[in-house]
């Protein structure tokens, strides 16, 4: 059976997500993919420069010293930290850890993830700078 009535279509503006802070933050978090793409492409170019010898590598290092590239990399770092923070806050919701018949709160898990991140970062920096 078909009807001749026109279905109600709720109007939706292209800026619907700007009305609530939750959606604005969601769009910001999803937007962290763009700086991640920038950094991935930059890393691939760096690997190719490393493959093609010292002169190519020095050209890449010169490219990295450009102030615009430094600013883009700082933006990429901030985006990566925001993305990491949101994932670390999501992790306790995905894992139900029970200790002594009580569900563990999210704080120890989040703090543990940040500690692991800091330790791995320090180890990588040590290996890169002093090994």
From Swiss-Prot:
The keyword Membrane applies. Signal peptide: none annotated. The chain crosses the membrane at residues 30-50, 57-77, 109-129. The keyword Lipid metabolism does not apply. It is a multi-pass membrane protein. One of its GO terms (cellular component) is plasma membrane. One of its GO terms (molecular function) is succinate dehydrogenase activity. InterPro entries: Fumarate_red_C, SQR/QFR_C/D. Keywords: Cell inner membrane, Cell membrane, Membrane, Transmembrane, Transmembrane helix. It is found in: Cell inner membrane. HAMAP family: Fumarate_red_C. Part of an enzyme complex containing four subunits: a flavoprotein (FrdA), an iron-sulfur protein (FrdB), and two hydrophobic anchor proteins (FrdC and FrdD). Two distinct, membrane-bound, FAD-containing enzymes are responsible for the catalysis of fumarate and succinate interconversion; fumarate reductase is used in anaerobic growth, and succinate dehydrogenase is used in aerobic growth. Anchors the catalytic components of the fumarate reductase complex to the cell inner membrane, binds quinones. Belongs to the FrdC family. This is Fumarate reductase subunit C. It comes from Citrobacter koseri (strain ATCC BAA-895 / CDC 4225-83 / SGSC4696).
């Amino acid at each position: 059976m078909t009807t001749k009535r026109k279905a109600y279509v709720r109007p939706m503006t292209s800026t619907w997500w700007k009305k609530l802070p939750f959606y604005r933050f969601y769009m910001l978090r999803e937007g962290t993919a763009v700086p991640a793409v920038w950094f991935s492409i930059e890393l691939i170019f760096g690997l190719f420069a490393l493959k093609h010898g010292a002169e190519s590598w020095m050209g890449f290092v010169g490219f990295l010293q450009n102030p615009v590239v430094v600013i883009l990399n700082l933006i990429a770092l901030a985006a990566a930290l925001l993305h990491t923070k949101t994932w670390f806050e999501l992790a306790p919701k995905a894992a139900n850890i029970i200790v002594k018949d009580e569900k563990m709160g999210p704080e120890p898990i989040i703090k543990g993830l940040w500690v692991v991140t800091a330790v791995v970062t320090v180890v990588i920096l040590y290996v890169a700078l002093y090994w």
